[in-house]
Amino acid sequence: MPKLVGKNGDEAVPTCGRCDKSGRWCDRSQSLRIRAQKNVGKHDEAAIHALGATQAKTADIRDPQSALQDEDIANYFEHYLKELAPWYDLNDLDMTFAVVVARRALRSQLLLSAIIAFAAVHKSRTGHAASKTLAETHHAHCLRLLIGLDNDDIEIRDGTALAATCLLRSYEILSEEEDPNRHLFGAFSLIPLLSSALPSEQLLRAGLWNYLREDITFSLINECPLKIELGEVNVEPRRDDDYASQITLLLGRLINAAFAKEQFTVERLRQAVSHWYSTCPFRPYHESHGSGFPRIRMLQNCHCAAMHYYYVAMCLVDVSNARPARLEEYARLICGSTFTANNDPTMRCEVVEKGR
């Protein structure tokens, strides 16, 4: 005999759908009593007020100069300048993301909204008081602006859109438990074709190097070739960060050859990497080895990052040639130089052992 149930139904007559599915019969002998939930009004009022304030801040960003008069927005902007921009300028002595991006954000709502989204989510994930709702709202606003761009728009041609996408890529990594790589893949359409020369526009060039480093990390973790086509482009080293860019290109080409099982190309690139190391003008000013990781100190972050890529390149060569004897040595060198780096951005450098 079906059970009599007097609650949890959907009030359909004669029998609610829930009871019909489970073989029960609704008991309607007593009237339905509805209990009010306490404090709903206060909670909703506070939530609506917070949402309205967040939306107002986003609307104001259409005028970046006015938006930065808001103390919260100014604090997030300053957090980007002090803490986050150095992540992107790791191999850039011109500090393009700290200087050019920041200056351009004063008149670009696309860049400013990307900066605020990234800075807010970073603060929320690192124990600071920060609004995740604000980060999400600015992220959505930035995406709408990006989607609305045409190929001929100046923000595509001058690197603004690519720089914003690089910032959103970092937002994506911090805001989600699993990295969906949406912005990494999306940035691919903004990358200029590389045939024999790098782009002349400074911000476009800086965005390209950042995208390439992200592409390298993704390829190492997933053991696949790069998405970006490197062509025959090369860097003529004139200063120290040029050497870091040069080894970045060599590592990218080596990744393509190693995962495509092109042993002849791997050997040719091994010789190029060895030549790079022999001509590289910087070395550690201190190196000591104990029972733990070695302590390796270098003058500049770009020196440390360049040597990281050199060690990773040599790991790939050894794996491709089935010579794993020095893999642990290279891994220890990477970790040692990271833990004794000048400052935090280098800690974010491409230390790929955890992905390998």
Outline where the language-model segments fall.
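Charge-rich, intrinsically disordered regulatory segments
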Residues: 1-95, 99-108, 129, 135-136, ...
